[in-house]
Amino acid sequence: MAHPTQLGLQDASSPIMEELLLFHDHALMTVFLISTLVLYIIMTAVSTKLTNKHLLDAQEIEIVWTVMPALVLIAIALPSLRILYLMDEINDPHLTIKATGHQWYWSYEYTDYDTLNFDSYMIPTQDLLPGQFRLLDTDNRMVVPTGSPVRMLITAEDVLHSWAVPSLGLKMDAVPGRLNQTTFIATRPGVFFGQCSEICGANHSFMPITIESAPVKYFESWSSSMLAES
């Protein structure tokens, strides 16, 4: 999760987020190099005696400032397109979960089980226990097995929402009457927080997302207890 005064993105907890972090660093380095070059040209132009101020034609430099930006754009576009295709790949998921956005909470349905579904509300500030996070913790966490491919089906019941968990590299719009899908693999155990990322009304800020990644044995125990309660 994010921390006060943090610089950079959250720690990656999925393969896609690791790819996004690498692309982020790649893009920032490209911007840094371009900025350094532009600053050097400006400083050189300021300090020169303008001996070529009447020069009207320079084919070589025109070729350079046409080809170089094209190469830079290609260097940014290719890894970006690769990540976009990776995010669309869904290969043999071990678990499918349907998340539905409401004003203002989320409901989850484990479609591989007959009756495993529940609502997930933000815990009010006055009900928080020691160690729980204000505006982030929920009364029911979405539990997934660590290291297993999980397919998410995202929709909404009323207005537009967006299901987003930054440390897993997830952000998918929840649209009424439409099913969007994405996939992720939690590479380590832990609790990951997200929030609705589409303004959806007065309590938009109060519909967090809490995902708990746990070993398979714990997940099986949790699912059995949830099925017994239902």
UniProtKB/Swiss-Prot annotation:
Intracellular or extracellular location(s): Mitochondrion inner membrane
Alphabetical list of SUPFAM superfamilies matching this protein: Cupredoxins, Cytochrome c oxidase subunit II-like, transmembrane region
Gene3D superfamilies in the record: 1.10.287.90, Cupredoxins - blue copper proteins (2.60.40.420)
UniProt cofactor note: Binds a dinuclear copper A center per subunit.
Residue spans crossing the bilayer: 15-45, 60-87
GO MF terms held by the record: copper ion binding; cytochrome-c oxidase activity
GO CC terms in record: mitochondrial inner membrane; respiratory chain complex IV
Superkingdom as given in the UniProt entry: Eukaryota
Mitochondrial matrix topological segments: 46-59
Catalytic activity, reaction form: 4 Fe(II)-[cytochrome c] + O2 + 8 H(+)(in) = 4 Fe(III)-[cytochrome c] + 2 H2O + 4 H(+)(out)
Pfam families (alphabetical): COX2, COX2_TM
Binding-site residues, Mg(2+): E198
Binding site for Cu cation A1: H161, C196, C200, M207
GO terms classed as biological process: ATP synthesis coupled electron transport
Membrane association type: Multi-pass membrane protein
Keyword Transmembrane part of the UniProt annotation: yes
Cofactor(s) required for function per UniProt: Cu cation
Family that this chain belongs to: Belongs to the cytochrome c oxidase subunit 2 family.
Xref: PANTHER family: CYTOCHROME C OXIDASE SUBUNIT 2 (PTHR22888:SF9), CYTOCHROME C OXIDASE, SUBUNIT II (PTHR22888)
NCBIfam families assigned: CoxB (TIGR02866)
Function: Component of the cytochrome c oxidase, the last enzyme in the mitochondrial electron transport chain which drives oxidative phosphorylation. The respiratory chain contains 3 multisubunit complexes succinate dehydrogenase (complex II, CII), ubiquinol-cytochrome c oxidoreductase (cytochrome b-c1 complex, complex III, CIII) and cytochrome c oxidase (complex IV, CIV), that cooperate to transfer electrons derived from NADH and succinate to molecular oxygen, creating an electrochemical gradient over the inner membrane that drives transmembrane transport and the ATP synthase.
Protein's UniProt name: Cytochrome c oxidase subunit 2
Native organism taxonomy: Eukaryota, Metazoa, Chordata, Craniata, Vertebrata
Originating gene: mt-co2
